[in-house]
């Protein structure tokens, strides 16, 4: 959200959880929509030039492809553990693209870090002492994590 806003785009956060709305607003999102509500996919049809899909849980890619404008692109960075079916007709008819990315190389990562430094973009993290690593792991399993955990190695003493 922060990078998209710094690039001058209108970022919409799509989420299954209403609990993420406040974070989306705080981060500067232009809009927020619940994907757990079927009307969202009707209201947002053909609205986006670009979708960055970070979801690792199985979900219907076709619903999201239909949110793309003609010539829109969806980049997949989440890796669901099950295959998914994809309808080719909406891709072909509207010249939409789907691509994937694991991570950038050293050059791309440095460009991103430089961009973030120029625009004063910082990561949202939760710092935990090493003694709480097991609790943090349990929270990850339960889906009770808002941001990345960072272990304070100073707590090893």
Residues of each region from the PLM?
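Conserved SAM-binding loop of SAM-dependent methyltransferases across substrates and taxa
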Residues: 2
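Adenosine-nucleotide cofactor-binding segment
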Residues: 5-63
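C-terminal hydrophobic helical "lid"/dimerization subdomain
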Residues: 6, 62, 106-157
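Residues in the short beta-alpha loop(s) of Rossmann-like NAD(P)-binding domains
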Residues: 17, 80, 104
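Well-formed, non-transmembrane alpha-helical positions, independent of function
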Residues: 23, 63-66, 90-91, 115, ...
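Short glycine-rich anion-binding loops that position phosphate/pyrophosphate groups of nucleotides
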Residues: 57-58, 80-81, 156
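Helix-to-beta-strand junctions that scaffold the AdoMet/dcAdoMet cofactor pocket
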Residues: 68-70
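Rossmann-fold dehydrogenase core element
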Residues: 73-75, 86-126
